[in-house]
């Protein structure tokens, strides 16, 4: 009886901390920018880093301005259909059977990721389902990223906001959610101390 009770508590705790899955899939991971390694794998990311991301549609925000290698691009058609559903949401990626704990978040659209069959298991540079990453992140997911140019992945986009864009948090400052919460929490503690 005691073991059943403990098992029930464990299941309850696990479900309480899991987030709802918004989207999931399998396909290919590629890279298209890098903030930290602007020159990597025989590529210069200078121009890509200046491009505006799809999720900050109203005010324009470049990859350089976001200043994070954790931004991920997903199927352009899907994200364009409802920016608020996907922008800033956490992405959990699995490569080589290992689930990443990197704080990845959706921030851009990927044209290649929205074409090709979702059931296709053969790489096609003109259209294959998947996600687009920074070079640094893709290299961390798989050390063959530079040599191969793409890796096999699976992913889940979960209902946890890691970054606020003008499309998913209108009227709020753009930026990492946890950083802003930390600032707000420090401000609240300072206010309480003054009372």
Q: Which functions belong to the PLM regions below?
A:
Residues 1-10:
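Classical eukaryotic N-terminal signal peptides for Sec-dependent ER targeting/secretion
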Residues 10, 15-195:
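Secreted/periplasmic proteins
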């Amino acid at each position: 009886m005691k073991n059943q009770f403990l098992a029930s508590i464990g299941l309850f705790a696990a479900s309480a901390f899991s987030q709802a899955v918004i989207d999931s899939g399998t396909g290919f991971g590629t890279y298209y920018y890098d903030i930290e390694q602007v020159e990597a794998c025989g590529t210069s990311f200078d121009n890509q880093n200046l491009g505006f991301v799809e999720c900050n549609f109203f005010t324009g925000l470049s990859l350089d301005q976001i200043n994070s290698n954790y931004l991920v691009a997903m199927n352009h058609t899907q994200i364009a259909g409802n920016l608020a559903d996907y922008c800033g949401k956490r992405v959990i990626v699995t490569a080589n059977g290992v689930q990443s704990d990197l704080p990845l978040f959706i921030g851009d659209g990927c044209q290649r990721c929205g074409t090709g069959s979702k059931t296709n298991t053969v790489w096609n540079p003109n259209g294959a389902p998947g996600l687009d990453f920074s070079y640094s992140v893709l290299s961390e997911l798989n050390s063959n990223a530079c040599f191969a140019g793409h890796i096999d992945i699976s992913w889940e986009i979960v209902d946890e906001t890691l970054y606020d864009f003008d499309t998913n948090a209108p009227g709020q400052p753009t930026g990492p959610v946890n950083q802003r919460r930390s600032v707000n929490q420090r401000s609240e503690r300072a206010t309480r101390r003054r009372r």
